[in-house]
Amino acid sequence: MAHKKAGGSSRNGRDSESKRLGVKRYAGQEVISGNIIIRQRGTQFYPGANVGIGKDHTLFATAEGVVKFERKGPRQVRTVSVVSAA
């Protein structure tokens, strides 16, 4: 019997491409208008002063300055602001 039995097939072996989410500019870093600060799924962080939000919830600078992270309100909502570099 010079035959080899058929090898088993695997139903695994797939994965999606990483989306490169996360913080792109950290607290204290200088940014210019249009710089992406955070890429996220949903609103883990909310926009504060001088920060806009895209349709995919990306936070970006709308003015020149320094990135500032803070927690606001009774729910301790995480916000990101851009304050003028003093």
Curated annotation (Swiss-Prot):
Any one GO BP annotation for this protein: translation
Residues spanning the membrane: none
Gene Ontology MF terms in the entry: structural constituent of ribosome
One GO CC term, this protein: cytosolic large ribosomal subunit
Highest taxon of the lineage: Bacteria
This protein's UniProt keywords: Ribonucleoprotein, Ribosomal protein
Keyword Ribosomal protein applies: yes
InterPro entries: Ribosomal_bL27 (IPR001684), Ribosomal_bL27_CS (IPR018261)
Alphabetized PROSITE patterns for the sequence: RIBOSOMAL_L27 (PS00831)
Residues covered by region (Disordered): 1-22
Family: Belongs to the bacterial ribosomal protein bL27 family.
HAMAP family: Ribosomal_bL27
Protein name: Large ribosomal subunit protein bL27
Species the sequence originates in: Acidithiobacillus ferrooxidans (strain ATCC 23270 / DSM 14882 / CIP 104768 / NCIMB 8455)
Gene symbol of the encoding locus: rpmA
